[in-house]
Swiss-Prot record:
Compartments, record wording: Nucleus; Cytoplasm; Cytoplasm, Perinuclear region
Position of the Glycyl lysine isopeptide (Lys-Gly) (interchain with G-Cter in SUMO2) cross-link: K225
Name of the protein in question: Fidgetin-like protein 1
Enzyme Commission number(s): 3.6.4.-
């Protein structure tokens, strides 16, 4: 009977939930019905009424339906679980006013019973450790006594030197927090004020009348911190301000007392307005103190950074930051001709700005920044920085073995360039190196690589420039850049100035040429070999071009060595193939390499590199598209000769026979080769 009754109960509940699900009611009851179904499934499976497989299927089915309602963003079919309850709670609440103040203050914290117990325990411990010598501060179990004198400004010196009776002052007590008394014990007794009647007007302010007044507590020494801080130790100060009136007028500041207390305490004690503001702060809540860290202008911050960077002594007094008039930027007013002082300097040292010595701005506004080298004194620092950072090449070193072929050109360059730079003591006089070298020939033969190898093997500073790096939209900037380039190169001797595509910079001058372009060429020729140049300068200009016939005659004269870089011969092409294939997996025999070299006649060095790159893609192209995503690098087959045969069908020589004939004729006329 129990089994049949329980089944009937389960059946009725199942039917009830099914009716709630299938009816057109809102989504809330539907979600509850699905959740009830899931609970029934778990209960039936726990009591072994259904199998695990059946429970898993049913649970998955109803869980998906339940999540479809819960996770849906649709207003009609989904269920918003949170918005309704949140809006209900927030709908009846009134918004807080902007003038709302928190009930949690320092006074309320000190009135708590737990804090009072801690303070009493601290008092007992401090009383046990109190020494008899500290007579100026007497700590009882319930009160703290301060030996404050009764100041009578108009009295004689004897009256001002006398101290009040200790028994009379013992009645005027005031409770202070534990940390206040601890620091007051360390600070002992302040010095007495003596003979103030000569300098002060008639004024008398006895301290005894304000014994019951509440003291405002701030630090005796150091800066005043904000009261509304999260730490209780930082909120509790030590400096005592009278809440009703000041003890000292503004004209009665004693130097000894001022040096003892610090400027912040004396200002607060001597200024009645500030004293009144402090008492108002105690009543109305925490307010920001006037002795917070002062604002620093961009110039002052830059000066501090320079002092820290160059480890120079701090020469600025306290008036450098607080005693002068604050203004954004420079200390003087900026007009039309004023100079903006950036907060962070661009130059980060003497070497990166072309030998310019970076000067701290605090050293003086009229003190100029003198360059380390006299040859750079008339140059703009921005141009020097551009040359040092953008034009100077910091690439990897290049060896002569990396250049295939051109044995005559390499031997000539070693003879006239590398050796004189390595041994300048031997190559003097007529043995001195030339001022310029011109490397001409078809494109892709290694002219740029030779220029880098010259700088790498000779240990020289390498400048790689182009026509675009020397031109500017401003009139006169191009020739200034050329002058700065050679000036920096003279400071960085030995130096190699490599000009790729030199025909675009030193083309033939004509009547229809622009004036700015003509001035740049003239300045370049003068700096290369002019009246101001020295024969002892170890500066080499290396120009590379594939259009030598367009170079100006004056530039051609200054480029003394004009070396023809022809297409690589068979041995050079073989060396290129072997060097490139040694880095890859290949199965080429010696005969196959010879066939590749023979078929690649009239190929330049760049064409040979492109041929090997195209052949290396052959094994990848032989794979199926589906295998590329799953195959490992070790499963890719090596490069075979058939890949080179397929590559020869797509790669052609980039130099025509007509261009080769032009180069050979120019070499016979102006070249220095065999």
């Amino acid at each position: 009977m129990q089994t049949s009754s329980s089944r009937s109960v389960h059946l009725s509940e199942w039917q009830k939930n099914y009716f709630a699900i299938t009816s057109g009611i809102c989504t809330g009851p539907k979600a509850d019905a699905y959740r009830a179904q899931i609970l029934r499934i778990q209960y039936a499976w726990a009591n072994s009424e259904i199998s695990q497989v059946c429970a898993t299927k049913l649970f998955k089915k109803y869980a998906e339906k339940y999540s479809a309602i819960i996770d849906s963003d649709n207003v009609e079919s989904g269920l918003n679980n949170y918005a309704e309850n949140i809006l209900t709670l927030a709908g009846s609440q009134q918004t807080d006013s902007d003038k709302w103040q928190s009930g949690l203050s320092i006074n309320n914290v000190f009135k708590m019973s737990s804090v009072q117990k801690m303070m009493q325990a601290g008092k007992k411990f401090k009383d046990s450790l109190l020494e008899p010598a500290l007579a100026s501060v007497v700590i009882h179990k319930e009160a703290t006594v301060f030996d404050l004198p009764k100041f009578s400004v108009c009295g004689s010196s004897q009256e001002s030197d006398s101290l009040p009776n200790s028994a009379h002052d013992r009645d005027r007590t005031q409770d202070f927090p534990e940390s206040n008394r601890l620091k007051l014990l360390q600070n002992a007794q302040p010095p007495m004020v003596t003979n103030t009647a000569r300098t002060c007007p008639t004024f008398s302010a006895p301290v005894g009348e304000s014994a019951t007044a509440k003291f405002h507590v701030t630090p005796l020494f150091g800066n005043v911190k904000k009261e509304n801080h999260s730490s209780a130790k930082e909120n509790i100060g030590l400096n005592v301000f009278l809440s009703n009136q000041s003890c000292f007028p503004a004209a009665c500041e004693n130097p000894q007392r001022k040096s003892f207390y610090g400027s912040g305490t004396i200002d607060a004690l001597s200024n009645p307005i500030l004293n009144k503001a402090c008492s108002k702060t105690e009543d109305n809540g925490p307010k920001e103190d006037s002795s917070l860290p002062t604002f620093k202008t961009a110039k002052e911050q830059l000066w501090v950074d320079q002092q820290k960077k160059y480890h120079q002594p701090q020469r600025a007094s306290g008036s450098s930051y607080g005693g002068v008039k604050k203004s954004l930027g420079a200390s003087r007013s900026r007009g039309i001709l004023g100079k903006f002082v950036p907060p962070i300097p661009k130059q980060d040292g003497g070497e990166q700005n072309g030998g310019m010595q970076c000067k701290p701005y605090g050293a003086g506004p009229t003190e100029p920044a003198h360059p380390v080298d006299e040859r750079l004194k008339n140059l703009e620092p921005k141009m020097i920085e551009l040359i040092m950072n953008e034009i100077m090449d910091h690439g990897p070193p290049v060896n002569w073995e990396d250049i295939a072929g051109v044995e005559f050109a390499k031997a000539t360059i070693k003879e006239i360039v590398v050796w004189p730079m390595l041994r300048p003591d031997i190559f003097t006089g007529l043995r001195g190196p030339p001022k310029g070298i011109l490397l001409f020939g078809p494109p892709g033969t290694g002219k740029t690589l030779i220029g880098k190898c010259i700088a790498s093997q000779s240990g020289a500073t390498f400048f790689s420039i182009s026509a675009s790096s020397l031109t500017s939209k401003w009139v006169g900037e191009g020739e200034k850049m050329v002058r700065a380039l050679f000036a920096v190169a003279r400071c960085q001797q030995p130096a190699v100035i490599f000009i790729d595509e030199i025909d675009s910079l030193l083309s033939q001058r004509g009547d229809g040429e622009h004036e700015s372009s003509r001035r740049i060429k003239t300045e370049f020729l003068v700096q290369l070999d002019g009246a101001t140049t020295s024969s002892e300068d170890r500066i080499l200009v290396v120009g590379a071009t594939n259009r030598p016939q367009e170079i100006d005659e004056a530039a051609r004269r200054r480029l003394v060595k004009r070396l023809y870089i022809p297409l690589p011969e068979a041995s050079a092409r073989k060396q290129i193939v072997i060097n490139l294939m040694s880095k890859e997996q290949c199965c080429l025999s010696e005969e196959e390499i010879e066939q590749i070299v023979q078929q690649s006649d009239a190929f330049s060095g760049a064409d040979m590199t492109q041929l090997c790159r195209e052949a290396s893609l052959g094994p990848i192209r032989s794979l199926q598209t589906a295998d590329i995503a799953t195959i490992t690098p070790d499963q890719v087959r090596p490069i075979a000769y058939i890949d080179f045969e397929n590559a020869f069908r797509t790669v052609r020589p980039s130099v025509s026979p007509k261009d080769l004939e032009l180069y050979e004729n120019w070499n016979k006329t102006f070249g220095c080769g065999k």
